[in-house]
């Protein structure tokens, strides 16, 4: 499965949350099916995401690329360190959590 294509299709056709602060809030509330983190996510944010996702039983996938690359894949002109897939849309991105 092409992860990058899956992320892009999910951003275009589904419902996603971009950004670490909003992502942490969504994980705390259990709003989402999958968390995707960039490889260079700051350690404190990474620790928070992993801890809260364990509590809410949300799978976390570490994207093998930087936040700049993740932002570019999402079609955004800024860095994206964390995104939450709430609804995948036409994407098959949720297959990576298995």
From Swiss-Prot:
The keyword Ribosomal protein applies. One of its GO terms (molecular function) is RNA binding. One of its GO terms (cellular component) is cytosolic large ribosomal subunit. Belongs to the eukaryotic ribosomal protein eL30 family. PROSITE patterns: RIBOSOMAL_L30E_2. This is Large ribosomal subunit protein eL30. NCBIfam families: PRK01018.1. Pfam families: Ribosomal_L7Ae. The gene is rpl30e.
């Amino acid at each position: 499965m092409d992860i990058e294509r899956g992320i892009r299709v999910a951003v275009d056709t589904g419902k996603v949350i971009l950004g670490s602060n909003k992502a942490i809030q969504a994980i705390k509330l259990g709003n989402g099916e999958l968390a995707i983190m960039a490889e260079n996510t700051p350690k404190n944010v990474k620790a928070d995401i992993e801890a809260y996702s364990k509590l809410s039983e949300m799978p976390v996938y570490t994207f093998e690329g930087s936040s700049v690359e993740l932002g570019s894949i999402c079609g955004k002109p800024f860095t994206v360190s964390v995104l939450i897939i709430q609804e995948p849309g036409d994407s098959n991105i949720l297959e990576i959590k298995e």
